[in-house]
C-alpha cells in the first residue's frame, strides 16, 4: 500500500520514471483485492500524465493507450457511486463535450464533500475545467477561487488552481492580483518541490513578473513626472506670491 501511495505522489510531482519504477517493483499477484483499484489508478495516472506532458507525439499516443486500458479495468471493478468512478465518468463526459452531463456528475461529487477539504478543492478544480472548455469564463474563475481557497485552508502546497486563476487575471489585465497570486503559488511550489508544477508555471510566472515589473516602472515614471510637475508648480506659486507681495508693497508705498 505504501508503495502505491509513493508512486501516486511521485507521478503527481512530475517524477514519472521514478513512479513507474516503484509500480513495476510491485508484484501484481501479491496485491490484495482491496488495493487492486489503487494499483490500476496509479498506472492510469502516471501514463495519463505522460501522454499529456511528453514532447514526443508518438509516445503520447502510446501512453494514452496504456492509460485507457487501465481506465477500462477500473470501470470494471469500481462501484458506480464511488468517487473514483464518478471522477472518471466526469472526465469522459467533459472530453466528449457533454458539459451539462459532466456538471451533473460533478454535482454528485460536491454533494459528498465538505468545503475547505482536499476533496472539495479537487472537485471544484475539475468543475472549473468544465466551465473552461464550455467557454464560461465567470464559472471557471468562481470555481478556481473556491478550489484555491480550499487548497490553502487544507495546507495543500500544490496550487494548480491558484496559478491558473492568476493566469486568467493576467489575461483580464488585473496585474496586481495576478502577480500576488502567482508569487504565492510559486513559493508554495518551491516548498513542495513539485517538478511538474514548476515546469507548468515557470513561463506564466516569468511573463506575469516581467509585465508587473514593467507596470511598476511605468507607475514610478508617472510618479516622478508628477513630482516634477508639482515641484514646478510650487516654484511658480512661490514666484507669484513674491511678485504679488512686491506689488502690494509698492502700492502701499505709493499711498504713503
Q: What kind of region is each of these model predictions?
A:
Residues 1-221:
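A "functional boundary" signal
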Residues 213-256:
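Alpha-helical transmembrane signal-anchor helices
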Amino acid at each position: 500500500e505504501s508503495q502505491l501511495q509513493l508512486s501516486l505522489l511521485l507521478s503527481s510531482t512530475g517524477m514519472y520514471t521514478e513512479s513507474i519504477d516503484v509500480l513495476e517493483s510491485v508484484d501484481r499477484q501479491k496485491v490484495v483485492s482491496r488495493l487492486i483499484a489503487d494499483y490500476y489508478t496509479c498506472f492510469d495516472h502516471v501514463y495519463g500524465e505522460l501522454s499529456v506532458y511528453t514532447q514526443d507525439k508518438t509516445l503520447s499516443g502510446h501512453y494514452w493507450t496504456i492509460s485507457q486500458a487501465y481506465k477500462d479495468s477500473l470501470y470494471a471493478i469500481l462501484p458506480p457511486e464511488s468517487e473514483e468512478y464518478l471522477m472518471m465518468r466526469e472526465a469522459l463526459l467533459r472530453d466528449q463535450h457533454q458539459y451539462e452531463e459532466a456538471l451533473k456528475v460533478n454535482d454528485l461529487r460536491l454533494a459528498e464533500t465538505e468545503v475547505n477539504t482536499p476533496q472539495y478543492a479537487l472537485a471544484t478544480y475539475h468543475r472549473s475545467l468544465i466551465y473552461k472548455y464550455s467557454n464560461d469564463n465567470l464559472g471557471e474563475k468562481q470555481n478556481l477561487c473556491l478550489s484555491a481557497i480550499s487548497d490553502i485552508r487544507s495546507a495543500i502546497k500544490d496550487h494548480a488552481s491558484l496559478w491558473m486563476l492568476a493566469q486568467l487575471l493576467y489575461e483580464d489585465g488585473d496585474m496586481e492580483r495576478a502577480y500576488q497570486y502567482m508569487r504565492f503559488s510559486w513559493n508554495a511550489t518551491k516548498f513542495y518541490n513539485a517538478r511538474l508544477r514548476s515546469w507548468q508555471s515557470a513561463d506564466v510566472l516569468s511573463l506575469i513578473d516581467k509585465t508587473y515589473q514593467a507596470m511598476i516602472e511605468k507607475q514610478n515614471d508617472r510618479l516622478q513626472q508628477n513630482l516634477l510637475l508639482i515641484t514646478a508648480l510650487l516654484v511658480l506659486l512661490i514666484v507669484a506670491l513674491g511678485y504679488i507681495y512686491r506689488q502690494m508693497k509698492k502700492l502701499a508705498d505709493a499711498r504713503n
